[in-house]
Amino acid sequence: GAKERNNAEAVRERLEEI
């Protein structure tokens, strides 16, 4: 669903921070 896709994007952004 759209929620899952949004979550994946947020996770990617967090990974960039690490």
From Swiss-Prot:
This protein's UniProt keywords: Gamma-carboxyglutamic acid, Ion channel impairing toxin, Ionotropic glutamate receptor inhibitor, Neurotoxin, Postsynaptic neurotoxin, Secreted, Toxin
Cell compartment(s), UniProt: Secreted
Any one GO CC term of the record: host cell postsynaptic membrane
Name the UniProt record assigns to this protein: Conantokin-Gm
GO molecular function, one term: toxin activity
Disulfide bonds: none
Superkingdom classification of source: Eukaryota
Annotated tissue distribution: Expressed by the venom duct.
UniProt function note: Conantokins inhibit N-methyl-D-aspartate (NMDA) receptors.
